[in-house]
Amino acid sequence: MVLRVLSRSCKLTTALAFGTVGATLYAAEAAPTHPAHSVKHAAPLGSAPVRHRNAGHATSRTATDAETIKVTTRKLPTRFNTEQHVGSSTTMISAETLQQRAVITTTDIQKLAPNLQIETQYGSSALNFHLRGVGFNDLTMNNTPSVMPYIDGVAYPISSMTSGPLFDIDSIGVDPGPSGFTHGQTTTGGEVRITTKAPEKQFHAGIAEDFASYNRSKTDAFVTGSITHNLQYRLAAELLEGGGYYTNRDTGQSLGDQHTGAIRGKLAWQPDEQTDVNLTGYWSLNRSEAPGFRINNNLSAFAGHYGRDLGYYQTGWDIKPAFAKLIGYHDTKPQFNDLNWGFHLAMAHRFRFGQLDISSAYDAVQLHEYQDQDGMPYATADDYRTQVANSFTQEVSFHNLKDSTSRFSWDAGLYYNRIMQKQNNYYDFSDYALRGYMSETRFSSPQETFNQYVTLGYKVLKNLRFVGSISHESDSRQLVDLTTIHFGHNDLNFGTHGALANQFTGKVGIEYQATPTSLFYADIRKGMKPGGFTANNTVVAQQAQPIKPETILAYEIGTKNDFFAHRLRLNAAAFYYDYRDQQVLGNIVVPSYGSVGSYVSVPRSTIWGVEGSMEAHPTRDLTLTQVVGYQRGVYDQFHSINAAQVNAYYAKTGIWQAFYSNYHGVDSGIPKISMNGSAVYTIHVLPHYHVLFDVDYSYRGAEGLIPGNPPYRTVPAYFLLNSFLTFEPNSRKWSATVYATNLADRKYDLTRSQATNVQTAISGPPRFIGGRLNYNF
């Protein structure tokens, strides 16, 4: 550190230098790559700290306007150092890691965090998030998730709204456990927070092109800069094409090509030094081919023609002219036609005693998806779904301006969300003997959620802090005019149903900063998720009844540590969940019809586990990471359909009959082990150029998807190995990369399901070998 102070007192100089560095340590760690700079005319000592848009720059306060202090920050090996002083088990993922680990879609995030699963809903574009065994398989896309996805601070409570491309990302935070105490909506499972890149004052642009196996191409571009001295912009776009690896077993046609495009625009305005206004608009279109369903076991009358698929990427499809006419479908392959768009407005004003944040968001989705769920050219389970939905969110929050010396902290806010949606779900059962018709289930579903929250923190000692939170959420939703039409047979009208939830949740916690780089914490949290409805192929009144809200009482202890000047990071956590009225996807057996999906509540269950992460920099050129998660879940009180026994009886007799089992003490099917790790080595080949070489892996344990964990609905464990080699200048202005994902070409499944009496799976991607060029200017 170099100090040049126009002061007569050397003692004052020393005090200023060390006092400033100590006060700004967290900020300097948060963005270690910022260059040294000088600050003149600093605020007087004792003035309120101000949160600036570029809050990672080291700043200094001086005694007189004549003084100048020059501060040089040291680049630390680790990232996200500020988060190391927060009592939570959040996993932070940087933009660089996302690119290096070839994260193409949102589902790829699960390869980087412990005890996290992100899966498509039986091959649709809608996503289901599970964290520490808590999650919800939203078969009907009309219920609130247990794990809430956020993009730039805006909650997405409809699963189909998270289907857009993942591009121009700044960071991702995976935060397990009940949430909703400082922002947003109450959850039982946690949050996945995606933050996109913000506008910059200096002009900056870039383009990246990625080519890979199966004719997959991915193009990303952005441009950012200033319009005026206090108005900045950023425009980013992505185009993803190809990559289909499924093959029609009869015709040899390929299936699964991606055809997606998206654009996002941002404006950042600072009308004065204490106010920030940010406007975001986005648009994305998905006209991709649907994934293929591989037959695992065929109990239908066509088993002689289409038995178990031996080729791992085999599938089949067809669409009958009558069904195509009914739904107005003109393509020959199963395909999506989804449109997502929205606007977000966020305003922040800093007072001397606190910051006021106001945000408004409007998001909309128009979804049209056709899938051949039986994987055959016969019409036993051909599905076409349409959804038109919009979400309006308004949030007002107020918090004090905290810094490392603050003894008291507080956050308070109000959150409101209103959703309107309409759905039509068509099925073609023409070739299924027990039905032999086409059907449509339609409904509309308005819902409102209102959450109020307060969080208080107090340092009883310099290094000991207590935290307390309370929130109250009310939720009202309806299922309006639920109707199922069996064309040529009958109409079933189930009327209108409602569900209410009105509960308090909260948190108490303690944080102990044992050393400047070692934190210990413990907390108890209660979370709540509203109830909801089954609204997919509804044939009996029981399906239309609402499920109860679920609650969790969560206990967690953890520690965060940096050793050897931040060259070794070790974080660990242990948790225990007391789960009440857990919402799971079960079955109802309807005689002379078959087994149909329906949400059921598990009165009592428990989940417990441990997590650990390591980041090591043994040398300047070597980085090692390792993440491990272990979890167990059991049903303590649960009596439900035994799906395996139902199917076995049908296979033997051709009759659908309900059989029930007591699942007390039975494993709930969550993946017990999840791991990922990487080794990245930098080779300095020339004075101004280097090569990055990486080997990384991910492992996920077996996952049972329905109670009892029958094999046909259990996704086996899998291990994936990846690698990349990047050549770039030290300035990182451009880079050239070759990479491989699933290097060992492992055969694995993304999900397993059953459509009428055909048990199917969706195969995971095979080995992809690709190259990526990136240029910034």
Predicted segments with their positions:
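N-terminal Sec signal peptide and the immediately downstream disordered periplasmic leader
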Residues: 2-12, 18, 24-101, 106-115, ...
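Acidic, small-polar-rich N-terminal luminal/periplasmic segments of exported/outer-membrane proteins
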Residues: 56, 61-202, 557
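Structural signature of Gram-negative outer-membrane beta-barrels, strongest in the C-terminal barrel
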Residues: 268-272, 398-401, 407-417, 443-578, ...
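Membrane-embedded beta-barrel scaffold of Gram-negative outer-membrane proteins
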Residues: 346-351, 355-371, 513, 519-527, ...
